[in-house]
Amino acid sequence: MKRLASSACVIALLIACGGEEADHQFDWLGADPGSDSDGDGLSDMDEAMYGTDPDNPDTDGDGFKDGAEVDQNSDPKNGNHFPYTGGWAIGDCWDDIESTGNEVGQIADQFELIDQHGEQLRLHDFCDRTVLLSSATFWCQPCMDEAAGFQDFYEDYEEEGFIVITLLSENADSSTPTVEDLGAWVDLFGITHPVVRDGRGSVTNTFVPDAQIVLPANHMLKKGMEVSFVARRDIVAADIESNL
């Protein structure tokens, strides 16, 4: 979510648009332009433009002040969209992505899956990064073999706008992973990037439709969520560098 340029721009917009509705909603324009009635870091004028409550510092009740959410590009009106416990930055383009599909050259579909912190993670929140989606299971030894290496890649290329998201579809019992299972995977390989529960491979199957999936299966998205390749094994540094 993009922060408004300035309250002055808001005033100019209102003057240009006019109308009774604007007069009703913004009858406080004579007030101090910097007024922040609820102390949440957003001026009352900006709150009106965002549609947040100027008298409630946490409009959506998710535990984060409205100003903090705007600064970190989450949605202050959606109680399920807030800064990640894992510390992964949210791109300000998340609400601009227009999905076309999960085939090479298309713009990847949004997904929302539970991460290792028990929070909903949205793919499009990483719209400003190169994303490696790694489809894996606990019983897949090759998946485990590459997991630590992917963490190394993440550490090496994070500052260049790269992130890994592991799509864990089954635990050691071939059941849908619990949050505890996700945490165990994280601990096993010292992972700091997102690991999410892809129950029954629901997301993985959208990248490899009508085909027998051979794990590990890795899918690369360029910045802007364009699908670069799908279902590839043996990822090397050059695969990442060519998509940064």
Show where each model-derived region lies.
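Extracellular calcium-associated, cysteine-rich motifs in secreted modular proteins
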Residues: G19-E103
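A short beta-strand-turn-helix
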Residues: Q110-V131, Y154-Y157
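Thiol-/selenol-based redox modules, centered on thioredoxin-like
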Residues: V214-L244
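Sec-dependent signal peptide recognition
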Residues: K2-V10
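C-terminal motif of bacterial Sec signal peptides marking the signal peptidase cleavage site
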Residues: L13-A16
